[in-house]
Regions:
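Extreme N-terminal tail/first-helix region
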Residues: 1-11
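Active-site-proximal binding-pocket segments
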Residues: 16, 23, 48
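Short, contiguous alpha-helical
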Residues: 27-79, 120-168
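Catalytic-site beta-strand/loop segments enriched in glycine and acidic/polar residues
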Residues: 12, 18
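Acidic/histidine-rich alpha-helical segments that form the ligand environment
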Residues: 8, 73-128
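Short helix-to-loop capping/linker segments positioned immediately adjacent to catalytic or ligand/cofactor-binding
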Residues: 23-26, 102
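Short, charged, low-complexity loops and linkers
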Residues: 1, 28-30, 95-97
Length: 168
């Protein structure tokens, strides 16, 4: 597994280790609980994996184009500087649907492995150029996708740790 994704996997496992049923469902009013956060992460990994798998099956990357200025700025902030903005609304395809915590965790870990393989396969086929476009960050290399998911995951792992340590 790629080093960024392996580190992400370890951090998710550590942040969710020992969570009881009540811990999985704890959240401040109007915010996602731990189960929803982990489900969201799993859906984001699964969506990236599926995009890569479909492109590989079709024999070409999903989108090769020059990035727009706004996409470049967002990608530099997130991927290069590790700054993930707060309050960005998740797209519908990665919004949690209500899986329980252990189920969401198992799915997230499996999706992370699937995404790692799909990104490695795409990188092997298309090299170090763009392998697909993120809806807000534009065209990205496999390395940028991995770093994006690491930064995005760390953003949410912080929330997992806050909720797990707050007895409410």
């Amino acid at each position: 597994m790629d080093a960024w994704l392996e580190r992400l996997q370890r951090e998710i496992a550590a942040a969710t280790a020992g969570l009881k049923d009540t811990d999985w469902h704890r959240a401040p009013q109007g915010h996602w609980n731990c189960a929803q956060i982990v489900e969201h992460l799993g859906r984001s990994y699964g969506t990236t994996a599926k995009m890569m798998e479909l492109a590989l099956a079709a024999g070409q990357p999903p989108e090769r184009r020059a990035p727009k200025f706004k996409e470049t700025i967002a990608r530099v902030l997130i991927v290069n500087l590790g700054i993930f903005p707060r309050g960005v609304k998740a797209p519908a395809m990665v919004v949690p649907s209500g899986n329980d915590g252990p189920e969401a965790l198992a799915h997230a870990m499996e999706s992370l492995k699937r995404m790692d393989k799909a990104l490695a396969d795409a990188e092997e086929r298309w090299g170090s150029g763009s392998v697909g476009a993120h809806f807000r960050l534009g065209p990205m290399t496999a390395a940028e996708w991995r770093k994006f998911h690491f930064v995005h995951g760390r953003h949410h792992i912080r929330h997992l740790r806050e909720r797990a340590s707050d007895p409410q």
